[in-house]
Amino acid sequence: MVVAIIGILSAIGTLTYSGYVKAAKRSSAENIMQQVSLAQTEEYSLTGEYWRSGAQDTTTCSANDKDASIALEAALFSGKEVITKSDSGFNMCIFGSASDYTIKAENADGCVLQLPRNGIVDAGNDKC
């Protein structure tokens, strides 16, 4: 009986801890997205347009590997590893136009977060 109770408590504790870690990583990703947004404001004030990933994507971008994050860091943070050295587990990219943008973050579990230029972070699916 005691062993069963300890087993149940262990299972509950593991699930609770996993949920806590997942929430902490998402919060970290959201904070980094806000930093990217600030860097975009500086980019716009210097060049008159916002930076976008890849081939000047306007409707979406792929954030499922580190290449997009590395390109973003090179363009907006002078290569400083703001995204790739974080413990968030998310990669990021940016899509939009010269006058508007959306920051997209994605992790290996398929959680997709999006932050439009003048909005709040939106979990694009139920995997977050």
Segments (PLM) and residue ranges:
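Membrane-proximal N-terminal amphipathic helix
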Residues: 22-49
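A generic "functional-site adjacency" signal
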Residues: 11, 30, 97-99
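Generic signature of intrinsically disordered, low-complexity, basic-rich segments
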Residues: 7, 19-23, 64-67, 71
